[in-house]
């Protein structure tokens, strides 16, 4: 997680400990949901923090942007903050890049939350909201995909085993070794996808 993410958790916790006496500006930085804290929206893209803010304000859920793979120390801060909010079970919805690395980050976040040192596997469920080609249709038009897709075969040969494994599951884009950055998606579509997912949990 990024430094800003940890600060948001820490400021939120300090606000709770001091009976909410910190300034409103800092209380608003807390990322733990005010109404449905156990519902967690996750993205790897720090540039989608605006979407996290939308999810939190519109739906009262917990929302975080990790800036890539999340470390166990940051996960511990996050877990502690959720436990202080009396969360015992967690449902996670993830929006990440449509590529091997986005899929891995989403999967690892869900798995880590289910570790026995945190909530335990039986208390965590999660889904990637843009894991398949069919999912992409909710985020992009065909023209946007064509413009935004990138050739994954151009990456280092050391990453090609990851590409092959991911391609075997997803079939890439139209049967080609392509991925796409999720933050290229239209903002309204991203908001609607969060709205759609929240209604299902």
Cite the ranges covered by each PLM segment.
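Nucleic-acid enzyme cleavage-core boundary/entry regions
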Residues: 1-90, 103-201
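Catalytic metal-binding/acid-base residues of hydrolase active sites
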Residues: 99
């Amino acid at each position: 997680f990024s430094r800003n993410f940890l600060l948001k958790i820490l400021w939120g916790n300090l606000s709770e400990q001091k009976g909410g006496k910190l300034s409103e500006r800092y209380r608003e930085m807390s990322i733990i949901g005010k109404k449905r804290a156990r519902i967690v929206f996750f993205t790897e893209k720090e540039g989608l923090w605006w979407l996290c803010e939308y999810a939190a304000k519109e739906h009262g859920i917990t929302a975080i942007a990790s800036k890539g793979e999340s470390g166990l120390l940051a996960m511990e801060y996050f877990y502690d903050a959720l436990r202080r909010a009396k969360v015992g079970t967690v449902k996670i919805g993830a929006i990440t890049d449509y590529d091997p690395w986005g899929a891995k980050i989403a999967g690892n976040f869900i798995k880590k939350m289910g570790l026995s040192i945190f909530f335990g596997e039986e208390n965590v469920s999660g889904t990637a909201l843009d894991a398949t080609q069919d999912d992409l249709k909710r985020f992009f038009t065909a023209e946007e995909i064509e413009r935004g897709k990138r050739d994954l075969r151009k990456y280092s040969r050391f990453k090609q085993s990851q590409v092959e494994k991911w391609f075997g599951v997803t079939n890439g884009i139209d049967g080609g070794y392509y991925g796409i950055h999720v933050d290229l998606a239209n903002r309204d579509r991203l908001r609607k996808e969060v709205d759609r997912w929240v209604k299902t949990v």
